[in-house]
Amino acid sequence: MLIRLKFNFKLWHQGLIYCGLLLSLSACTTASTVSPQHTETQTKTIDKIVEAPPTFEAKLVNDKGKYYCSDGQKAFGPVTQKMIEKCLDWGGGSACNQTHWSETLFLKAYGNGRCPDGSRLNSITGYCVEGQNAIGPFPQQLVTACSNADGGNSCKSQRWNTRLLYNLLRNEELIKAPETPPQFVLLAFDGSSSLEAWNKSRNFAKTLEQKGINLRFTYFISAVYFVSNENRKLYDAPAGKGRGRSAIGWGGSADDIQKRLEQVNLAYQEGHEIASHAVGHFNGNNWSEADWKKEFEYFDKFIFDAYKINGLTGRLAFDRNGIEGFRAPELGTSPGLFRTLEKQGFRYDTSRSNQPNYWPQKQNGVWNFPLASITTALTKKSVLSMDYNFYYLHSKAKSNSSQAKRYEEDTFKTYMNYFENNYKGNRAPLHIGHHFSAWNNGAYWNALFRFAEAVCGQPDVQCVTYRELADFMDMLTPTQIAAYQKGSFPKVIADKNSQTNPVEVEEIKPELCQVSEQIGTQKLTPISSLNNGFLD
């Protein structure tokens, strides 16, 4: 008997996105091996009947609405890399890499969230994702569609490449892009040193949430702030910059770093995004691909080994799969950077600039989310949509506190003009970048917070992280992006109250589920026959 569960699942207003969650999974089996003597030729009779392999039930993990596969005693996934790490920490040894775990171990490692530890919810598809992989169990309709597209054994896995999942959802008409797009607003910070700035930004988002306004920041963190001064020689910067050198200093004491890591974890757990701002904040406009690869390797080492390097206890709330985006220090890019971003697992880059009405395109395999070239409201000067550029324009990057209120007003009105033009125009995403610095007596932070409070609660406005924008963009075809760029959609402003209410979706409990031979870190290759001209 089907058990119906209800949960809140965020969809864009006016039914803009349709996801076929009202699906049930049909019976499936583990792969069976038939011995060679029973498969000699088609003309010979098989002299031994192979018993039908067992089927597995899909059981609720917790009260958040996700499932796992079980035979009543053992759990057959889904398992993430983070869960495997926890299992190993608990002394599980080789059992952590088995195709099945005890239900007790599985549920403990899964965590208390809707998605298994180490993954996050993609609100466009409704599936949890770990890096570039979506996590099942998947409904029979999608499994059948995958098989019909010659997906082979990959279709029976509980881990699909997200590109594959998007293509299947589109082909089966289970997901549909909105005719009128939301107005995305992206607010991000570069830096990560100041504990005061971490607390101030996080607390501001909480204050808005109490008012019914959703806002999530993206934090582009610099890895040197997670290396103590005494460990600085661990870093040998690319392009001959020298060992132990940094353009922005270091992380201070181990205690300083412990507190900073706590802020990173809290921000991530509160729904903000953590992304990469490289390591030493050097301008890489002349760096080779090898230089950038070296820099990214240092970033991973200093961030994900931060506790070990600095003699601390604890662990990050996410692993390398959680780092999906990049912004180059000083926006210094080179051809070598764009050749390596996709290879390093990044989904998007925010290091370029473009016109304010630009709809993102993929370049070199990653989404291009550029800052905007905009005109200031009071001084009518051209400036990038980033606080430092206002600071330089206003006072040549030197403090002038006596004019702080005027600078704040100019910045706020400029941001509002940027918003109004896009909101009433083609709704291209807004990109605004700030730093963990209170230049000109905090004028730019004040302007940013005033702006966020003014727009994030408006109808059809989504103040989200960059990875959430990437989730939305992954759903679109080039034709749909071109239509958005032209503004070829109804200019409808929804009612504010209807926009803020979550849509209630009914999900049917799957009776049985697919079980693959591999769990954990299995990686899948997208099925080429499913590309259908969609973006790579």
What are the residue ranges of the model-derived segments?
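N-terminal secretory signal peptides that target proteins for export/translocation
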Residues: M1-L11
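C-terminal motif of bacterial Sec signal peptides marking the signal peptidase cleavage site
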Residues: S26-A27
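Short, low-complexity, disordered segments immediately C-terminal to signal peptides
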Residues: S32-V50
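Extracellular/cell-surface secretome signature
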Residues: A52-W160
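Active-site beta->alpha N-cap acidic-glycine motif
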Residues: R159-E273, F302, A306-R339, Q355-P356, ...
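C-terminal domain-boundary segment and adjacent tail
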Residues: R159-L168, E209-G212, T218, Y348-P360, ...
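Active-site-adjacent pocket scaffolds in enzyme catalytic domains
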Residues: P238-A247, G251-G252, L312-N426, T477-Q485, ...
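Conserved, mostly hydrophobic/aromatic
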Residues: H277, L341, F369, I432, ...
